[in-house]
Every structure is written in C-alpha cells, then in structure tokens.
C-alpha cells in the first residue's frame, strides 16, 4: 500500500520548502530512525534511489577525485559497477583489485597489497557473496594511514539486519551501504549508514541536487514499513534464510550436482553457487527458466523469497530435486508451479 500511495507523485526538501508536506517529512524521519535502530548506526540516509547510487554517494564523501580505491574484482565476483569504466571513471578514481582465494578475499595478500598501495577506500562487498568479508582484518591497518573501509552490503543487508551475518559497522567499517530489495525485503532503493560524524556530514551536504532530487517518498514509506518488519521479525527471517541456503546446497550435492564449497562450507549467506563455465551457465539458466525455476547466468540461487513465503528445509530438498531433474532433461514445470502455489502468503510481516 505504501509503495502505491499518493506519495509517489509528491516531493519534499529539508527544511520544509514545500507547503503541505508535513506528513512526508514525518515518514522520511521515521524511515531514518528505523534504519538507525535496525542497524545500530548513528546516521542513516534513505535518499539513494539504488544501491549503486548509495555507493557513489559513499565514495564521493570519502575519496577525492584522482584518488584510489581497492575492491573485489568485478570480473571475479565483485560488483560490475566498480569496473574501471563505470563508477571509478565517473568519479575519477583508479582501481586496484583485492586478491581472492576460494571465493574469499585472500587476507594475507590483501593486507600486504593495501599496506603497499594505501588506497583512499577499501570497498568490501560482492555480487556473489557466500562468506563474510575481512572487515576487522583490514580496518585497523586502513585506518592507520587515514583510509576508510566502505562495506557494500547490497546482497546481504537483510542478513546483517537480522544479526546472522557479520556486523560491518561494529567490525570497523566506516560506512555501510546497500540496496534495499535483495535479502532485505524492501522496495527498490538504497540506504547509507555510518557512525562517523564527519562522513555523515559530507554525505548529507552532497546528497540533494548532486546525486538525487526527488527521492520517491512512496519508496521511503515502503522502506519504513520494511524496516519496521525487519526490526520485529528480522532475526527469525534471516536465520531461516541462511538455514535454507545451507540445506539447499546440501540437497543439491545429494542430488548429484556440485555446488561450490570451500574449507568453510557451502555458504554463510542466502546464496548458493553452482559453478559452470560461461557458455554452459547460460544454457543451465535457460533450462531452469523453462521449468519455472529462476537462477541467473551465474548460476546463483537465493533463498530469500522462498523463505518469506514460508518454505523450509523440506521444500529445499524438493527444489534441489527439481533442479537436478530439469538439468537431466525432465520437464518439471508443473511440479515447480504446484510447489510454488502451496506457498502464496507472505511471512515475517
């Protein structure tokens, strides 16, 4: 209801520039306060229209033009927006790629590289994120030379909110940001959080008429609702999401497939990864979609939506069997639809 409300055609600025916007201002402040509560932060901005915009705003506030950033390689599992011809080109940054090992950042090599290169910001986050990032291991050293740690929680924001993944701000990240529609079950949009007063001020002063103007207050209202739901039910939701991901991975293995795992296990997040070469991955994705099972060209699976519809470990086993059968040539469309139709109501509200 909030997302489809009349606020979708209204806008406001602080201080109250437009008359008749008192209730919009109240909703705006409510969303920020809920964000501070849920994530344990002193500052929260709900102005970004996406996680991408939130990342640009965070970097603009912490890295000068001509500066250097370090990030997970976009060609490996990192965010494509940090490729050299994307955000870095727009904001005028050079980029170094953090070394990886078994789908994790290689901490020893990363510490050595960052100590040598001294990037203005180390961006920790990835599009394929199975395991926690080494925030604590890098933060003390980065802070020692005056750099900042920016944690892009876009994919794991709901798990952070639920307290079942790492807690970046407590571990030393200066800024945490993310999109609000992935593991966090809100509307499309972005959020920025920090406990650093100086960075908060820089983010605020560079927000309006630089990165955004109208911040879509129907979105802000819907985000406030989602934040309140997460405040009440986040722990239970996030716990079940991760449990379902682990069960799905184990069930895929039992069904004869080979989900990625390293010495830590299959996953600590909502994601499960089936590693294929690029051309084969596209074929796998296409087969699954024809059978009403949605993955991406990765091949990544996520357990957030099925969890929010009330599915548990039993259904993860059923889904794994359907995936294996489909990839073995069977037509499982009807079975997939039948399973989905048994779980139509939304939980954790």
PLM ranges: what are they?
Residues 13-18, 217-218, 348-349:
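Short coil/turn segments at secondary-structure boundaries
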Residues 1-18:
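N-terminal "arm"/small-domain region of PLP-dependent enzymes with the aminotransferase-like
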Residues 227, 238-302:
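Conserved small-domain helix->loop->beta segment predominantly found in fold-type I
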Residues 243, 247, 299-349:
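PLP-dependent enzyme catalytic core of the Aspartate aminotransferase-like
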Residues 5-10, 210, 244, 248, ...:
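A short structural micro-motif
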Residues 211, 291-295, 327:
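A common structural junction motif
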Residues 19-26, 30-258, 304-311:
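Conserved PLP-enzyme active-site core in the AAT-like
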Residues 16, 184, 264-268, 288-289, ...:
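A structural signal for short secondary-structure junctions
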């Amino acid at each position: 209801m909030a997302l489809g409300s009349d606020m979708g055609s209204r806008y406001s600025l602080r201080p109250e520039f437009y008359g008749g916007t008192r209730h919009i201002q109240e909703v705006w402040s409510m969303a920020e306060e809920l964000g501070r509560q849920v994530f344990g932060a002193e500052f929260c901005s709900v102005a970004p229209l996406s996680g991408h915009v939130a990342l640009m705003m965070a970097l603009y506030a912490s890295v000068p033009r001509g500066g250097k950033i370090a990030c997970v390689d976009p060609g490996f599992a990192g965010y494509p927006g940090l490729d050299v011809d994307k955000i870095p080109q727009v904001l005028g940054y050079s980029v170094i790629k953090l070394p990886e090992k078994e789908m994790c950042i290689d901490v020893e090599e990363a510490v050595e590289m960052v100590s040598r290169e001294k990037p203005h910001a180390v961006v920790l986050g990835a599009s394929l994120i199975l395991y926690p990032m080494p925030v604590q291991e890098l933060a003390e050293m980065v802070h020692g030379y005056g750099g900042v740690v920016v944690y892009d929680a876009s994919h794991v924001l709901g798990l952070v909110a639920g307290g079942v993944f790492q807690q970046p701000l407590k571990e030393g990240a200066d800024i945490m940001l993310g999109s609000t529609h992935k593991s966090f079950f809100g509307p499309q949009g972005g959020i920025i959080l920090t406990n650093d007063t100086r960075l908060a001020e820089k983010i605020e002063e560079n927000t309006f008429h630089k990165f955004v103007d109208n911040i879509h207050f129907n979105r802000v209202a819907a985000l406030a609702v989602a934040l309140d739901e997460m405040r009440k039910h986040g722990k239970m939701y996030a716990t079940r999401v991760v449990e379902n991901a682990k069960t799905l991975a184990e069930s895929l293995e039992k069904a004869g497939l080979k989900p990625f795992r390293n010495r830590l296990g299959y996953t600590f997040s909502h994601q499960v990864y089936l590693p294929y070469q690029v051309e084969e991955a596209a074929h796998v994705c296409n087969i699954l979609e024809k059978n009403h099972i949605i993955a991406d060209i990765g091949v990544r699976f996520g357990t957030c939506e099925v969890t929010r519809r009330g599915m548990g470990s039993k259904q993860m086993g059923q889904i794994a069997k359907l995936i294996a059968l489909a990839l073995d040539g069977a037509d499982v469309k009807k079975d997939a639809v039948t399973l989905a139709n048994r779980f139509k109501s939304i939980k954790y509200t």
